A protein has these predicted regions:
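Glycine- and aromatic-enriched membrane alpha-helices
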Residues: 1-186
Length: 186
């Protein structure tokens, strides 16, 4: 809940309007962030971790837009960004006795950073190899000329005309235009 509130509030402050997707992604980011250390932190600290997770979801989404990276549902900042934060938060805020590792705070943070690095290298490596192998079997990207023409045309031989009828536009603009009748059509 705190992640949803922080994401919604930050999103409103940045965009000057309420965005439901930011609330939902903030809620998810808060949950992702607290998952790793939920057993080892107090309720106020859990709220802080969720709050930062929600803010990361908004900031990460804005960063991806700025970089031109397409993430239609905000999965990268919600899972990657808030996940990294939550993993670090275990080292920063986790009760060392409950964690039971015998490490100092600094050592625990180091272990959490090492875990993030190992996971990143492993996931990137496996994903890269898998995608390269799949691309050899069947191309994962269509040729540029197919993108330019549109996949409906290049793959299906179909063209869609999305022109909005004038009476619909007029109604949307608030003017009163006579609507076509069946006798008006040829």
């Amino acid at each position: 809940a705190v992640g949803a509130l922080s994401a919604g509030s930050l999103g409103f402050a940045v965009q000057n309007h309420v965005n439901v997707t930011q609330f939902v992604n903030g809620c998810l980011a808060g949950l992702v962030a607290i998952t790793a250390g939920c057993f080892a932190v107090s309720t106020p600290v859990a709220c802080l971790i969720g709050l930062v997770g929600g803010m990361i979801s908004v900031g990460g989404d804005e960063l991806l837009k700025y970089l031109g990276i397409d993430d239609a549902v905000g999965a990268i900042p919600v899972h990657l960004g808030a996940g990294i934060w939550g993993t670090l938060a275990v080292g920063l805020y986790g009760n060392l006795e409950i964690l039971g590792t015998g490490l100092t705070r600094g050592e625990q943070i180091g272990v959490q950073l090492l875990g993030i690095l190992v996971c990143a290298v492993w996931v990137f490596g496996v994903a890269y190899i898998t995608v390269r192998l799949l691309d050899r079997i069947t191309p994962l990207r269509v040729p540029a000329e197919h993108e330019d023409a549109g996949l409906n045309l290049s793959e299906h031989g179909e063209v869609e005309d999305y022109e909005i009828p004038e009476h619909v536009l007029a109604e949307f603009r608030g003017t009163n235009v006579r609507q076509p009748h069946s006798t008006d059509r040829e």
